[in-house]
Structures are given as structure tokens and as C-alpha cells.
Amino acid sequence: AASDVYKRQLLFIGIGAMIDFGPLLSQPVMFLFGAAAQFGIFFAICVATLMGFDLKDAASIGIIGAADGPTSILVSQIMRSDYVGAIAVAAYSYMALVPIIQPFAIRLVTTKKERQIHMTYSPKAVSRSTKIAFPIIVTIIVGLISPASVALVGFLMFGNLIRECGVLQSLSDTAQNELANLITLLLGITISFSMRADAFVRVDTLMIMGIGLVAFIFDSIGGVLFAKFINLFIKNKINPMIGAAGISAFPMSARVVQKMASEEEKGNIILMHAVGANVSGQIASVIAGGLVIKLVSQYL
């Protein structure tokens, strides 16, 4: 079991090596949207508990709302959930369905006028030293706030440090391609062993899929409502759709938000703002996973 968890953590090195935190560092306010868009996780945990799942299983199911397949699998493995296979299928299925789910969720809580809001993009310059220091600082801060998250965030940030240091290009390329692809393949094979028909084709699986969908929808709605709340206090309004990009499905969610903005009004470019929020969601989802592990472990 320990080796399985280790394999999953290695995948975060590959993910970290793929991420450019530049759009986020040039607009630090986007950190808030990544945090706000994790609301669905905790809402789904409550729903799963009310539906009769054990706390460890409910916590694992709720993490589907992180819109992050590796985090969902890792948390369910650490919590020793009985539904690892169903959770993995739900997490990756809904990640693929982001272009269908998110527009529906966004339109539920926004008006056409809000979706047409233009945002100026004037990023601050981000130095190489800042990009190198960022993963180190994040790991230290997360370690102080939520030590249980370091196992996840540390690997993610280590991968990003390999990318940004500028002297380990071959390692960076390997992490982004060979390592990520190999671990993904091994991950799929490992999960498949827990997906026997008698253990997978059950009513519980349908319930998990349903709760996962609720988590995804409420993630998007939570981010949008947070953006609308912020707009009450600022002069230069934020397009509320940016809040929905705070989930971890990178870069799919940012593309969906930009596509919707263009459909509402041609020439409305909010892609870089959406990417900043989307990158923030990558960090926030991993931290949320660590927090859930810590909080639930205290009651088991």
C-alpha cells in the first residue's frame, strides 16, 4: 500500500513540472479564487455522510470535487476507502466533462451582463528568482499550516522547482513526459484491480457518481459566487466566470471560461485571468486534500 501511495505522489512531480505559475504570480489575487472553488469538496463530504457513507469514504468521495484525479486517488488510498475504483472513475470522468458541466453551473448563477464583463490584463513582471523561490515558500507555509498536505504539495512544488531552476532541463522534460506517462499507466493498472464487477457494479457506485457531480457543480458555483461577492467592494469588476476557473482541471477550465466569454461577446479576452485562477486551483486542491486527511484522521 505504501508503494502504491508513493507511485501516486511521484505523479505530482510530473504535474508540477508541467505548470507555469507565472500567470498566478503576476496576479496574486487569483489565489483567492482557487481557494473559493474548493467549496464543493466540503459540501460533498456532508452530502455523502448524510447518505450513509462512513466518514473515511465520505471524505474520499468529497475529494472528487477537487477536479484532480491524482489527488482523489491518493486521498482515497490514504483513507483506505472501499471505493477507490469508483472514485477514480468519477474524478476522471467529470474532469473530461468540464466543458459540459461548467457552462451549465456558471449560467445557473450569472446573468448575461455579468458574463460580458471585460477585464484589463496588466500583469506584473515575474522574475526568475521569484519563480524559483515560490515553490520553496509554498512548501514551507503549507507545512506550517497543514503538515498533512506536505506529502502532496511538496512533490508538486519539487516538480515545479525542477522546471524553474533552469539547470535541470533533461530532468524537467523527463518528469513532464516519461515519468508522468509511466506513472499514469501504472496508476490505471493498479486501480483496475479494485474494479471487479461485484465490487464496482453496485448502487453505491451510482451514488458516488451523483455526489461527485454535485461536488463539481458546487465547486464552480462557489467560485462564481465568491467573485460576485468581491465585486460588491471593488470598482473594476471581475468577470464572475473567473471564479469557476479556480478548480483544478488545468487548463481545461480556463479554456471553457474563455470560450464562454467569447460566445457572450466577441473580443472579450479573459484567458490569462482564468489561467491564473486555474493554476491557483491546482495548489488549492492539493492543500484541500491534505486538510481533509488531517481533519478526518482526527476522528477515526
Please tell me what each predicted stretch does.
Residues 26-32, 54-65, 71-74, 82-90, ...:
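The feature identifies polytopic integral membrane transport proteins across all domains of life
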Residues 93-167:
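Membrane-embedded hairpin module used as a gating/binding unit in multi-pass transport
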Residues 138-223:
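Transmembrane helical segments that form the transport core of multi-pass membrane transport proteins
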